[in-house]
C-alpha cells in the first residue's frame, strides 16, 4: 500500500475558501485503478497559516504514478492555480510506502432512546 500526501500552508483567514474549493471539486478518483481512499485533513494553526494535507491511499506506488499521468489527474487539477492568493507557498508532496498495517475494529453498542410497544 502507498500513501500520497500534499501538504498545504493556507494563509490565516482563508481556511473556509480552501475547504470550499475541496468540497466542490470532483477528484475523478472513484474509477482509478488502485485507488482506495481519500481524506483532506486539517492540522494545527501556526502564526500566519493553517496546515492541511490531502491524504490518498493506493494499492501500489505505481498505481499512484499512473494516475498522475492520466486524463483523470489533469481533470482533477484543472484550474488549481486560480486561488494562489490563499496559499503560503507551493504544496509539498510526500509519498510513503506502508510497511506496517493495523486495523482496529470499532464495535458500536447502543440502546434505544425510547421503546415502542411497552418494552
List where the protein language model places each region:
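An amphipathic, aromatic/His-enriched active-site/gating alpha helix that lines ligand/cofactor pockets
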Residues: 28-36, 57-94
Amino acid at each position: 500500500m502507498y500513501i500520497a500526501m500534499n501538504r498545504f500552508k493556507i494563509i490565516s483567514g482563508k481556511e473556509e475558501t480552501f475547504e470550499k474549493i475541496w468540497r466542490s471539486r470532483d477528484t475523478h478518483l472513484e474509477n482509478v485503478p488502485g485507488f482506495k481512499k481519500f481524506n483532506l485533513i486539517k492540522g494545527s494553526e501556526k502564526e500566519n497559516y493553517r496546515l492541511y494535507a490531502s491524504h490518498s491511499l493506493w494499492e501500489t506506488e505505481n498505481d499512484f504514478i499512473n494516475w498522475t499521468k492520466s486524463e483523470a489527474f489533469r481533470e482533477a487539477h484543472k484550474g488549481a492555480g486560480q486561488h494562489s492568493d490563499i496559499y503560503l507557498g507551493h504544496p509539498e508532496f510526500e509519498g510513503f510506502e506502508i510497511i506496517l498495517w493495523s486495523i482496529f475494529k470499532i464495535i458500536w453498542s447502543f440502546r434505544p432512546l425510547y421503546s415502542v410497544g411497552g418494552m
